[in-house]
Structure formats: structure tokens, C-alpha cells
């Protein structure tokens, strides 16, 4: 059997063994995709014992390409909502998550100086303790750029594997510890979260207002500044018993009921100007109007602003909301449409059908993958990651690398959405498949390279001390920030658990947090809010640590 055939066969065996290990769960918690790392260690041990020779060039390519696939698909997935997560609504959560990353870096630096831990080893411990695989890849690349011998670079994978198990267990123990210390009632926390959302902290809400301001009588909607802004959408108007879709030229009269959509603060401002909020229903049931959601799939409308499509004037249809990558937005007239956007339409059935034809609404297109944008994005990401940034006093130029470059490019392209007929939307199933394939390939190679010396290091070398260092790097930031967030910020427990899981980019921890309450989405929401920024910081941190330690050492 040739080297290439043997290498592919061994990698397939690693994936099978590793995924089987990852599916083993204790009380609903397992290693998940991280099991591939331990499958690689097990198989790598026996490959080394048998004296098999694998293709080192092929292993290197597979490791790097797997990492690129993984970080690129993550960026495409979270890109549309990344910049929205940095708004004020998620600012507090992101600040606490950033604090966890900073404290983890400081603990790593202190351990490195006190115990003189070799640079590759301490970076591997850091990456494993925070359960972040792209950090491992970024650290290995910067070490190679610094001229570190390959044998030492491979040590990083071994120390990563030593610290990884407690990295997963540590976050779960922290959640349990917070629950015990503060005697948390999970049901009460879930109810508090729901009450917070209903009291105006969700992004988009609706309000029915009766026109009582005499100054607005017989004015056109377009002449009322609060109604002609991009912050408020008036999607329905009820006069006596007649429900209609208002256009910019619609004349409003005293006593009219307006159904407005917008953010809570903007709705409150509109209510102060227009009149009194009422409980009267403006439902389309029993009328000739209906509400329907359609999806943007027509390439001809991609990148066009809503105002330029003239849906109100041509079809008497209002877009009341726009959902982009799971984030509800006000459908402002300046918003540009992207592939996969979901539009909430209000109008007559025939008019809605006409608008649906204009925007596409072809569900089958959502399952198709454009491969050209994928490789354009990967190529641009690799180029971005290769651009050197020279910092005075640093021994080498900083680079985003093969982990950071594709991630940043994917975030940007995911936010842009489309350029001409190229769109970077990727069906969730396809995104997940490429992401899982990438991380399996990367971890399989890391495990194989670490497996030969893993047992000896654990039983006869420094393996146990590495595990101890990892426990400090995992536990100190999580417990410190967990206490601060709960005591001083009065953070909801379920939200706190999601934020802690997101700060470690740890899906098994998110699964555990979600299982704390069957119906609450608090943990998933906070996890998604901090995940994109934390992933970026986790990739950059080991590079900064490596350059600083190298310069100081």
C-alpha cells in the first residue's frame, strides 16, 4: 500500500474511532467532535508501535486545509449577526466574555514565567484548557514562523490533549458551582428571562396606537417624521371596521388605529407623538389582508434597497420585518436585500404573491450551494492571513494566519451577503457538513502526531503537571467572571451559563446549559451573542502570547 493510501486509511480509522468516542455520553455530556482528537491519539500510539510511515506532507496539508474549512464556515454562519451582536444589546455580555479571555491569557503568562514551561507546551495547554481548536492551529503556525523545530511544535498538540478534558469538565463544574453558591431556582430564572424579553428588551416589538394628536389629523403618513423614518414601520391601519395597508400617501385621521413595528424605545417615542397605546387587535383574520413570510432567492434583487423596489407603491404591500440569519430587524427603506433574507409581508393575497415572485421565494434554492463563492472566500481569506503586520520590537511580523484570515474574510463576506450574482449564503446543512469535515480532519492529524509519545508523557513525563496548569487556566477566569457577573451585574443564571459556554466556544457546554431548562432560549441566545467575537480573540491570543514570550525570552 502506498504512503498516500495508507495515510487516508489511517485518517478514516481515526475519524471512526474518534466520532464513536465523541458519541459516548455521561449524564448527557460527551466530548462530541473533540473525541476525534483522542481517537487520533489512540490510533497514533499503535501506528508508532507498528513502525508505520505516513505521508508527512499529506498530513500537513490535511491539517491546515481542515482548519481553514472549519473557521471559514464558522465565519459564514455567524457573519450576518456578528456586527449586530456588538451593539448595545450584547455589549455587556461581550465585555464579560472578553474579560474571560484576558484573564485566561494573564494566567497563562504567569504560569509560563513561574514554572518555565516551554513555549509550545504552554500554548497547547492554553488552547486545550479553553477547548478552542483554531487557537491550537494559530499557535502552531506562529511557532513555525518563529523558527521553532517541528518536534517542539508537535508538543503543542500533545499538551492540548492533556488539558482538553478538564477544559470541557471545568465549564460544567463552574455552572454547577454558580448554581450551588447562589442557590439558583432554574424555573424562576427562566421566568425572569421571559419577563425581561416581554418588558421591552427584545430587539423588535409591535404596538397598536390610536391617533389622538389633533395636529396629525388629515396628514399623510409621509409627512409625519416619526412614521416616515427608518426606525418605525406602519404595516396596518384600521379605520372604523376597515383594515388596510397604508402607503406613504395615506391620509391619517383622528381615531385611526396604527400597527407599528420597531425597537421599544422608538415605539415609545412614536406613542408620545401620535396618541394612546390600545389593546385593540389589528389581526388580519376575517379581512382581505394576510401576513406571510417569503424568502429572498432572486439574484436580480440582491443588493437592492427596499425603497428602490417600490413594494408599497406598486403592490400595496408592506415589509414589516426582515429576518437575517435569525436576527429580527426593522425593514428600513435603506436596507439592502441579501440571499436568504426572510421578509414579513402584509397585504392582499394576490399582491403578496406578486411580491413573492419578485423576490424569488424559491425554497429549493436555499438547499443549493454555490461553490464558486466558497473558494473565492477561502482564497481571499488565506491571502488576508498572509499579510504581515510589522510591530516595532517584535521578532517577527504578526499575521492573522490560516486560522484568522479565513475567519475574518468569512465574517466580512457573510455580512456583505452578495456581490452581483455571487452570494455567500450557505444552507445550514451544507455549512455544518463542511465545518464538521474540517474539524475532523484537523483533529485527526493533531491526534496522530501526538499519539506516539502521549502515554509516556502522561505516565513518565510532565503530563500530570500539564493537566494541573490547564485546570488553573480553565477554572480561574470562569469562576472569577461568573462571580462578578452574578454579584455585581445581577446576570440571569441561564444567560450566564450561555455566556460562559460561548466564552469557551464549547458546544458540549451549550448543550448542558440548554438542558438546564427545557423551553428557555436564554443560554443559546447569550452563547450566540458572544461566540463570534470570542472565536476571533481566541485565535489572536495565542499568537500574541507566542510573540510576547518569544521576545521576552
From Swiss-Prot:
Signal peptide: none
Keyword Cell cycle in record: no
Record key words, sorted: Cell membrane, Membrane, Repeat, Transmembrane, Transmembrane helix, Transport
UniProt subcellular location: Cell membrane
InterPro entries per UniProt: AAE_transporter, RCK_C, RCK_C_sf, Transpt_YidE_put, YidE_YbjL
GO biological process, one term: potassium ion transport
Topology relative to the membrane: Multi-pass membrane protein
Organism of derivation: Citrobacter koseri (strain ATCC BAA-895 / CDC 4225-83 / SGSC4696)
The keyword Transmembrane is annotated on this UniProt entry: yes
Domain RCK C-terminal: 192-276, 279-361
GO MF annotation terms: monoatomic cation transmembrane transporter activity
Family: Belongs to the AAE transporter (TC 2.A.81) family. YidE subfamily.
Entry's Gene Ontology cellular component terms: plasma membrane
Annotated Pfam families: Asp-Al_Ex, TrkA_C
Name by which UniProt lists this protein: Putative transport protein CKO_00031
Positions of transmembrane segments: 4-24, 28-48, 65-85, 95-115, 158-178, 371-391, 393-413, 437-457, 464-484, 493-513, 533-553
